[in-house]
Amino acid sequence: MAASTMSICSSACTDSWRVVDCPESCCEPCCCAPAPSLTLVCTPVSCVSSPCCQTACEPSACQSGYTSSCTTPCYQQSSCQPDCCTSSPCQQACCVPVCCVPVCCVPVCNKPVCFVPTCSESSPSCCQQSSCQPTCCTSSPCQQACCVPVCSKSVCYVPVCSGASTSCCQQSSCQPACCTASCCRPSSSVSLLCHPVCKSTCCVPVPSCGASASSCQPSCCRTASCVSLLCRPVCSRPACYSLCSGQKSSC
């Protein structure tokens, strides 16, 4: 076979991964076995008529524009390889969900618009989160073992606590009942679209009701200027519910 066909000899040959004339028994399909000296552009056209090579896939609309952005040992995915990657050296052996556009798949080492990772590549057990894969993540070490609701980061996706908290969770209007034990005091930068879920860990006690009372517990509640007006606990003891103005509550 002529070297112009870009066939690549397999490891069964004497000199592995060479672009040379080699026998049929050790010839790999064109553009399917990357070598450091090759530009990884999947356009198998010269292999069609060769008995030593088989085309990796049928020509497609996106094939001509597919160029790998990965390093040499990285697993690649394209429209001619529809099976998604299960692990990739580029992603530290993580299971990598991919966002596939109809007809043409996006390479896993690129970062398309709808593919948002929740953790860095340095974490060996990280998982990736994407708005195209709505049930991808269950827990991630980068989020301190918190369950991360899958909701595209927008005006309605506002974290309530910092990543340093081991019991933190994320809260958003897309997942209104997300938090179980998280601070419910939104700051001025929090969107009003985000309805906080109040729990006792961050609530403000009412002095007249005792230290154990909390604004998030229905027995004794208080609304403060720092607490969102959207968060309104139900009070079972009306006399104990005082507004900022000092008036009694009607609840």
Swiss-Prot record:
Ranges of the Sequence repeats in the UniProt entry: 26-30, 31-35, 52-56, 84-88, 94-98, 99-103, 104-109, 126-130, 136-140, 146-150, 168-172, 178-182, 183-187, 202-206, 220-224
Any single GO CC term annotated in Swiss-Prot or TrEMBL for this entry: keratin filament
Keywords (A to Z) from UniProt: Keratin, Repeat
Residue ranges of the region described as 15 X 5 AA repeats of C-C-X(3): 26-224
One Pfam family linked to the record: Keratin_B2_2
Signal peptide as annotated in the record: none
Tissue expression per record: Restricted to a narrow region of the hair fiber cuticle, lying approximately 20 cell layers above the apex of the dermal papilla of the hair root; not detected in any other tissues.
Superkingdom of source: Eukaryota
InterPro entries: KAP (IPR002494)
Positions of disulphide bridges: none
Family that this chain belongs to: Belongs to the KRTAP type 10 family.
Physiological role: In the hair cortex, hair keratin intermediate filaments are embedded in an interfilamentous matrix, consisting of hair keratin-associated proteins (KRTAP), which are essential for the formation of a rigid and resistant hair shaft through their extensive disulfide bond cross-linking with abundant cysteine residues of hair keratins. The matrix proteins include the high-sulfur and high-glycine-tyrosine keratins.
Subunit and partners: Interacts with hair keratins.
The name this protein goes by in its record: Keratin-associated protein 10-10
Source species of the chain: Homo sapiens (Human)
